[in-house]
């Protein structure tokens, strides 16, 4: 039935969204290793590519995570589009079939618009981020090298400061998406009760702020010269490892 389909779509969005949340929290943790210096950061990136070898091939874990990410992305975006289309159709057929207080309705509409356009911004940003730091097809700031993640990051923000604006906008969208998404996902999964609502709101706010601050810390430090520039020459050539990012 339509009701069961709607519930299923919301659950798909909730589970896939929570997976994304855990992934970006781990990613943010990894990015903060930049402050420990070039060897630590590049070594960490190299470790991700050799983790669980020889049980898995080189970069095996990363490819597994990428496959899961693609599946979650398709599911999340597909479910969001399905719900948006259904809601639009319902409003067109019977605009006020379910009456709400004006303030509640306006807040709901605002949240939905924010999530929808925030999702579009994040999708475009993911493509840009992959092109810049994974495939190295977009290299603002200079010549990037596979395996020299520290240098690539430095060039991307120090020598091409306009990329900072891209990341600021995208990560603000991520923070808003996470703030609303944590609440929405837990509500969908039945984890919110009256007594825990204040706590959930606090957690959602802290998660959103933590993501924004953690992800913007490195670009900000690079832009204002608060971290060391990469050493001359190729870190990859000196260490014989292909770390990447």
Indicate where each model-derived feature is located:
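Membrane-embedded alpha-helical bundles that constitute the cytochrome b-like, heme-associated redox core
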Residues: 1-245
């Amino acid at each position: 039935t339509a009701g069961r389909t709607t519930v299923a779509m919301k659950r798909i969005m909730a589970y896939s969204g929570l997976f994304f949340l855990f992934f970006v929290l781990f990613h943010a943790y990894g990015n903060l290793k930049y402050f420990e210096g070039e060897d630590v950061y590049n070594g960490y990136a190299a470790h991700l590519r050799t983790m669980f070898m020889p049980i898995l091939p080189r970069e095996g874990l990363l490819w597994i995570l990428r496959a899961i990410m693609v599946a979650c992305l398709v599911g999340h975006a597909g479910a969001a589009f399905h719900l948006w289309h259904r809601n639009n159709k319902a409003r067109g057929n019977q605009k006020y079939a379910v009456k709400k207080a004006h303030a509640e309705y306006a807040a709901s509409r605002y949240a939905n618009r924010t999530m929808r356009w925030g999702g579009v911004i994040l999708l475009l940003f993911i493509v840009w981020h992959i092109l810049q730091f994974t495939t190295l097809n977009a290299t603002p700031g200079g010549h990037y090298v596979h395996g020299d993640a520290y240098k690539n990051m430095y060039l991307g923000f120090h020598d091409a400061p306009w990329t900072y604006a891209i990341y600021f906008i995208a990560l603000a969208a991520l923070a808003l998406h996470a703030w609303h998404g944590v609440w929405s996902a837990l509500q969908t999964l039945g984890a919110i009760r009256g007594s825990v609502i204040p706590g959930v709101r606090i957690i959602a706010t802290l998660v959103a702020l933590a993501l924004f601050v953690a992800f913007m810390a490195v670009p900000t430090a690079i832009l204002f010269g608060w971290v060391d520039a990469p050493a001359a020459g190729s870190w990859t050539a000196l260490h014989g490892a292909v770390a990447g990012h």
